[in-house]
Amino acid sequence: MSTTKRCYYETLEVDRSADDSSLKAAFRKLAMKWHPDRNPGDASSESRFKEINEAYEVLKDGDKRAAYDRYGHAAFEQGGAGGPGFGAGFASSFSDIFEDLFGMAGQRGGRGTGRERGADLRYNMEITLEDAFVGKTAQIEIPVSVTCESCSGTGAKAGTKPKTCSMCGGAGRVRQAQGFFTLERTCPGCQGRGQTIEDPCPACSGAGRIERERTLSVNIPQGVEDGTRIRLAGEGEAGLRGGPPGDLYIFLSLASHEFFQRDGADLHCRVPISMVAAALGGEIEVPTIDKGKSKVKVPSGTQSGRRFRIAAKGMPVLRSRQTGDMYVQVVVETPQNLTKRQQELLAEFEKLSSGATQPEAAGFFTKVKDFFGTRGAAS
């Protein structure tokens, strides 16, 4: 009965003044929410879905909407102005909308050719800090799928060709009417390729590609960092049935270095020096990443942990003429396993020492003395 039907405007959750774009937007939103495929086994969602379709079919048509606004549901009852109808026109418009909803329209461009792009490949390579400093050309061997030479990647035996799929006509997808709406799915006859192979190539079993080891040259530029990615276009997995190949991505990682630590373009190192060298001062010689040596002047009275900068002795900056710096941190080494004579000399040195020779220690103990002296007076 017409009296049991909900108002079409209420069904689409829009005002009576809603324009075409508002109606379409509301329909898309509700159709997506209540589509049976998104609510399997829910009978109420299927019923709601039908109501939404019926309401939209009427309100999107100017003449039907005018009749509905004037007579309500009675306009489409037996003998009225004509029912909403769910013929071929509805199936077409409904299908177009769902192509937008589920992205089907964008997929059509690649159908019917049978070609598929090859997958991208990843290769992890570890290099040394020295390699990153000078750059190098490395040779790598990778297992990769290449186009079958026997069939030129078609998958068909020599002298034959793939045939257009008779089930989908080369589209790769088929449409199936279910009641008042149409669903589109991957063609089961060709698995979406649009072509079938009756006589497969014996060399590749119809795949259109075979597995082989391939040697490639990889150019590693100066200044690469840990995690740098190098792309080799077209060196990935071969495409199917003549499709384009994928790309190969080389991911670089830097091995830890026994002497240097890297921070961007700068290099850091720790150099132990004796207590005497720190006290009297002098020069120390340190290795550099370019296999050379640099001298660092250590002033007298240098404390452990002090850093010295050597300009332009770091790493080159990738794709730049700039170069980082090198930082040398001195670590004053406390003598161990002293002889009796050495202990005597150090004890003598301690007796001769004053606050002037050890200002930080003298200042510290003065603060401690003042602290406890203040607390004693307060108590």
Curated annotation (Swiss-Prot):
The cofactor required is: Zn(2+)
Q: What is its main location?
A: cytoplasm
Q: Which domain of life is it from?
A: Bacteria
What molecular functions are annotated in GO for this chain?
Answer: ATP binding; heat shock protein binding; unfolded protein binding; zinc ion binding
Location(s), subcellular: Cytoplasm
* CXXCXGXG motif repeat ranges per the UniProt record: 148-155, 165-172, 187-194, 201-208
Q: Specify whether Nucleotide-binding is a keyword of the entry.
A: no
Q: Known InterPro entries for this protein?
A: DnaJ, DnaJ_C, DnaJ_domain, DnaJ_domain_CS, HSP40/DnaJ_pept-bd, HSP_DnaJ_Cys-rich_dom, HSP_DnaJ_Cys-rich_dom_sf, J_dom_sf
Residue ranges annotated as zinc fingers (CR-type) are 135-213
Q: Which SMART domains match?
A: DnaJ
Which of UniProt's keywords are assigned here? Chaperone, Cytoplasm, DNA replication, Metal-binding, Repeat, Stress response, Zinc, Zinc-finger
Its Gene Ontology cellular component terms are:
cytoplasm
Q: Which residues bind Zn(2+) 2?
A: C165, C168, C187, C190
Q: Using the record's annotation, list all stretches that form the J domain.
A: 7-72
A GO BP term here is: protein refolding
Q: How is the cofactor bound?
A: Binds 2 Zn(2+) ions per monomer.
Pfam families annotated for this entry?
DnaJ, DnaJ_C, DnaJ_CXXCXGXG
Q: Where does Zn(2+) 1 bind?
A: C148, C151, C201, C204
Q: How does it assemble?
A: Homodimer.
HAMAP family recorded for this chain? Answer: DnaJ
Tell me which family the UniProt entry assigns to this protein.
Belongs to the DnaJ family.
Domain writeup: The J domain is necessary and sufficient to stimulate DnaK ATPase activity. Zinc center 1 plays an important role in the autonomous, DnaK-independent chaperone activity of DnaJ. Zinc center 2 is essential for interaction with DnaK and for DnaJ activity.
> What is this protein's function per UniProt?
Participates actively in the response to hyperosmotic and heat shock by preventing the aggregation of stress-denatured proteins and by disaggregating proteins, also in an autonomous, DnaK-independent fashion. Unfolded proteins bind initially to DnaJ; upon interaction with the DnaJ-bound protein, DnaK hydrolyzes its bound ATP, resulting in the formation of a stable complex. GrpE releases ADP from DnaK; ATP binding to DnaK triggers the release of the substrate protein, thus completing the reaction cycle.
Q: What is this protein called?
A: Chaperone protein DnaJ
